[in-house]
Amino acid sequence: SSLRVRPGQAAVFLYQNKGTYDVITGPYDDVVRTENMPVLASIIGTAYKGGTPFPAEVYFINLSKGMELPFVIPFFRVIPSEPEYKAYDIEVAIKGAMTFEIPTRQEYLKYFLEAWGSSDTSMADFESKVKTLLTQEVKRVVSNAPKDTGIFIMHFNALIGELGRYICSRIQDPIAHRFGVFASGINIEDIRYDEESEGYQRLKRLTEDQTHLYNLENEKTALLGYEIQRQTMRT
Protein backbone atom coordinates (compact mmCIF):
# COMPACT_ATOMS: atom_id res chain seq x y z
CA SER A 1 0.00 0.00 0.00
CA SER A 2 1.12 3.53 -0.63
CA LEU A 3 1.27 5.88 2.33
CA ARG A 4 1.37 9.64 2.56
CA VAL A 5 2.25 11.22 5.90
CA ARG A 6 2.33 15.00 6.02
CA PRO A 7 5.01 17.01 7.84
CA GLY A 8 4.06 17.31 11.49
CA GLN A 9 2.22 13.99 11.43
CA ALA A 10 3.06 10.41 12.33
CA ALA A 11 1.41 7.22 11.11
CA VAL A 12 1.18 4.57 13.82
CA PHE A 13 0.68 0.97 12.67
CA LEU A 14 -0.92 -1.06 15.46
CA TYR A 15 -0.68 -4.80 14.91
CA GLN A 16 -3.12 -7.57 15.74
CA ASN A 17 -1.87 -8.32 19.23
CA LYS A 18 -2.43 -4.61 20.10
CA GLY A 19 0.89 -4.50 21.93
CA THR A 20 3.32 -3.77 19.10
CA TYR A 21 3.48 -1.01 16.56
CA ASP A 22 5.68 0.87 14.12
CA VAL A 23 5.78 4.63 13.64
CA ILE A 24 6.46 6.43 10.36
CA THR A 25 7.06 10.15 10.84
CA GLY A 26 6.26 12.59 8.05
CA PRO A 27 7.02 13.79 5.54
CA TYR A 28 6.65 10.40 3.87
CA ASP A 29 5.14 9.53 0.48
CA ASP A 30 6.01 6.02 -0.63
CA VAL A 31 4.97 2.39 -0.60
CA VAL A 32 4.82 0.81 2.85
CA ARG A 33 7.21 -2.12 2.97
CA THR A 34 7.91 -4.65 5.68
CA GLU A 35 11.62 -3.99 5.39
CA ASN A 36 11.08 -0.35 6.43
CA MET A 37 9.23 -1.31 9.61
CA PRO A 38 11.53 -2.92 12.19
CA VAL A 39 8.87 -4.18 14.59
CA LEU A 40 6.83 -5.78 11.82
CA ALA A 41 9.95 -7.30 10.27
CA SER A 42 10.77 -8.96 13.57
CA ILE A 43 7.29 -10.53 13.63
CA ILE A 44 6.88 -11.88 10.09
CA GLY A 45 10.32 -11.45 8.58
CA THR A 46 11.19 -9.74 5.30
CA ALA A 47 9.89 -12.28 2.85
CA TYR A 48 8.83 -11.32 -0.65
CA LYS A 49 11.48 -8.59 -0.81
CA GLY A 50 9.86 -6.63 1.96
CA GLY A 51 6.43 -6.82 0.40
CA THR A 52 4.83 -9.26 2.81
CA PRO A 53 1.12 -8.51 3.34
CA PHE A 54 0.25 -7.70 6.93
CA PRO A 55 -2.86 -6.61 8.86
CA ALA A 56 -2.64 -3.45 10.95
CA GLU A 57 -4.73 -0.55 12.17
CA VAL A 58 -3.29 2.82 11.12
CA TYR A 59 -3.67 6.00 13.17
CA PHE A 60 -2.53 9.44 12.07
CA ILE A 61 -1.31 11.59 14.95
CA ASN A 62 -0.68 15.33 15.04
CA LEU A 63 2.86 15.94 16.32
CA SER A 64 2.54 19.70 16.84
CA LYS A 65 4.23 20.82 20.04
CA GLY A 66 2.22 23.99 20.59
CA MET A 67 -1.34 22.70 20.79
CA GLU A 68 -3.36 24.47 23.48
CA LEU A 69 -6.40 23.51 25.51
CA PRO A 70 -7.97 26.55 27.21
CA PHE A 71 -9.78 26.16 30.50
CA VAL A 72 -11.84 28.32 32.85
CA ILE A 73 -12.40 27.04 36.38
CA PRO A 74 -15.14 28.81 38.38
CA PHE A 75 -14.67 29.73 42.02
CA PHE A 76 -13.56 26.89 44.27
CA ARG A 77 -12.43 26.76 47.88
CA VAL A 78 -8.79 27.12 48.97
CA ILE A 79 -7.75 27.03 52.63
CA PRO A 80 -4.64 28.85 53.92
CA SER A 81 -1.94 26.59 55.36
CA GLU A 82 -1.22 28.84 58.35
CA PRO A 83 -3.07 27.49 61.43
CA GLU A 84 -4.15 30.96 62.53
CA TYR A 85 -5.80 31.65 59.14
CA LYS A 86 -7.48 28.30 58.39
CA ALA A 87 -10.87 29.65 59.38
CA TYR A 88 -10.67 32.14 56.49
CA ASP A 89 -11.04 29.98 53.39
CA ILE A 90 -11.13 31.86 50.09
CA GLU A 91 -12.86 31.21 46.77
CA VAL A 92 -10.46 31.26 43.80
CA ALA A 93 -11.18 31.18 40.04
CA ILE A 94 -8.55 30.40 37.40
CA LYS A 95 -8.37 31.02 33.65
CA GLY A 96 -5.57 29.59 31.55
CA ALA A 97 -4.47 27.05 28.97
CA MET A 98 -2.62 23.76 28.91
CA THR A 99 0.02 23.37 26.19
CA PHE A 100 0.42 19.77 25.13
CA GLU A 101 1.86 17.39 22.57
CA ILE A 102 1.44 13.73 21.62
CA PRO A 103 4.77 11.90 21.95
CA THR A 104 5.40 8.77 19.89
CA ARG A 105 7.38 7.07 22.65
CA GLN A 106 6.01 3.68 23.64
CA GLU A 107 4.88 4.64 27.14
CA TYR A 108 2.74 7.49 25.76
CA LEU A 109 1.38 5.69 22.70
CA LYS A 110 0.17 2.83 24.88
CA TYR A 111 -2.07 5.16 26.89
CA PHE A 112 -2.99 7.23 23.84
CA LEU A 113 -4.25 4.26 21.84
CA GLU A 114 -6.12 2.89 24.84
CA ALA A 115 -7.90 6.23 25.25
CA TRP A 116 -8.52 7.16 21.63
CA GLY A 117 -7.95 4.06 19.48
CA SER A 118 -11.59 3.03 19.14
CA SER A 119 -12.55 5.90 16.82
CA ASP A 120 -11.32 8.98 14.99
CA THR A 121 -10.63 11.78 17.43
CA SER A 122 -11.08 15.46 16.60
CA MET A 123 -9.86 18.39 18.66
CA ALA A 124 -13.43 18.89 19.87
CA ASP A 125 -13.57 15.28 21.10
CA PHE A 126 -10.24 15.73 22.83
CA GLU A 127 -11.28 18.95 24.54
CA SER A 128 -14.56 17.58 25.84
CA LYS A 129 -12.90 14.53 27.42
CA VAL A 130 -9.68 16.06 28.70
CA LYS A 131 -11.17 19.22 30.20
CA THR A 132 -12.99 17.29 32.90
CA LEU A 133 -9.80 15.65 34.17
CA LEU A 134 -7.76 18.83 33.65
CA THR A 135 -10.21 20.86 35.73
CA GLN A 136 -10.21 18.27 38.50
CA GLU A 137 -6.43 18.12 38.62
CA VAL A 138 -5.87 21.89 38.56
CA LYS A 139 -8.38 22.35 41.38
CA ARG A 140 -6.74 19.57 43.38
CA VAL A 141 -3.22 20.98 42.95
CA VAL A 142 -4.17 24.60 43.68
CA SER A 143 -6.32 23.64 46.68
CA ASN A 144 -3.40 21.75 48.20
CA ALA A 145 -0.64 24.17 47.16
CA PRO A 146 -0.61 26.19 50.43
CA LYS A 147 -0.34 22.99 52.48
CA ASP A 148 2.12 21.22 50.16
CA THR A 149 4.48 24.14 49.47
CA GLY A 150 3.86 26.75 52.17
CA ILE A 151 2.86 29.40 49.62
CA PHE A 152 0.66 32.12 51.11
CA ILE A 153 -2.77 32.07 49.51
CA MET A 154 -2.80 35.84 48.98
CA HIS A 155 0.38 35.56 46.87
CA PHE A 156 -1.07 33.50 44.04
CA ASN A 157 -1.04 36.41 41.58
CA ALA A 158 2.44 37.52 42.57
CA LEU A 159 3.69 34.00 41.79
CA ILE A 160 1.47 33.30 38.79
CA GLY A 161 4.28 32.04 36.54
CA GLU A 162 5.78 29.77 39.16
CA LEU A 163 2.33 28.50 40.12
CA GLY A 164 1.65 27.56 36.49
CA ARG A 165 4.88 25.57 36.28
CA TYR A 166 4.10 23.88 39.59
CA ILE A 167 0.61 22.90 38.43
CA CYS A 168 2.03 21.51 35.19
CA SER A 169 4.56 19.33 37.00
CA ARG A 170 1.82 17.90 39.22
CA ILE A 171 -0.72 17.10 36.49
CA GLN A 172 1.64 15.57 33.91
CA ASP A 173 1.35 11.99 35.16
CA PRO A 174 -2.47 11.88 35.53
CA ILE A 175 -2.95 13.44 32.08
CA ALA A 176 -0.42 11.08 30.47
CA HIS A 177 -1.75 7.93 32.12
CA ARG A 178 -5.35 8.70 31.19
CA PHE A 179 -4.99 10.18 27.71
CA GLY A 180 -1.44 9.54 26.47
CA VAL A 181 -0.54 13.20 25.98
CA PHE A 182 2.32 15.20 27.48
CA ALA A 183 1.37 18.43 29.25
CA SER A 184 4.33 20.67 28.44
CA GLY A 185 3.04 23.83 30.08
CA ILE A 186 0.28 25.55 32.03
CA ASN A 187 -0.14 29.22 31.21
CA ILE A 188 -2.28 30.97 33.81
CA GLU A 189 -3.90 34.05 32.32
CA ASP A 190 -5.82 35.18 35.38
CA ILE A 191 -6.39 34.25 39.02
CA ARG A 192 -9.33 35.89 40.75
CA TYR A 193 -10.39 35.93 44.37
CA ASP A 194 -13.97 36.34 45.47
CA GLU A 195 -13.19 39.73 46.96
CA GLU A 196 -16.75 40.19 48.18
CA SER A 197 -16.61 37.15 50.43
CA GLU A 198 -16.26 37.52 54.18
CA GLY A 199 -13.28 35.18 54.29
CA TYR A 200 -11.31 37.25 51.78
CA GLN A 201 -12.14 40.56 53.46
CA ARG A 202 -11.17 39.33 56.92
CA LEU A 203 -7.95 37.65 55.77
CA LYS A 204 -6.94 40.74 53.83
CA ARG A 205 -7.44 42.94 56.90
CA LEU A 206 -5.52 40.55 59.13
CA THR A 207 -2.52 40.17 56.83
CA GLU A 208 -2.13 43.45 54.96
CA ASP A 209 0.36 44.70 57.56
CA GLN A 210 2.26 41.41 57.70
CA THR A 211 3.67 41.16 54.19
CA HIS A 212 7.16 41.47 55.65
CA LEU A 213 6.70 38.04 57.24
CA TYR A 214 6.55 36.34 53.84
CA ASN A 215 9.50 35.83 51.49
CA LEU A 216 8.43 35.55 47.86
CA GLU A 217 11.79 34.10 46.83
CA ASN A 218 11.38 31.26 49.31
CA GLU A 219 7.88 30.61 48.00
CA LYS A 220 9.17 30.56 44.41
CA THR A 221 11.79 28.01 45.41
CA ALA A 222 9.15 25.85 47.08
CA LEU A 223 6.90 25.93 44.01
CA LEU A 224 9.68 25.13 41.56
CA GLY A 225 11.30 22.48 43.75
CA TYR A 226 8.84 19.80 42.63
CA GLU A 227 9.44 20.60 38.94
CA ILE A 228 13.22 20.48 39.42
CA GLN A 229 12.91 17.16 41.22
CA ARG A 230 10.90 15.65 38.36
CA GLN A 231 13.36 16.93 35.75
CA THR A 232 16.21 15.36 37.70
CA MET A 233 14.38 12.03 37.86
CA ARG A 234 13.91 12.04 34.06
CA THR A 235 17.63 12.54 33.33
Residue ranges and their predicted role:
Residues 64-235:
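Elongated, amphipathic alpha-helices that form coiled-coils and helical stalk/scaffold elements used
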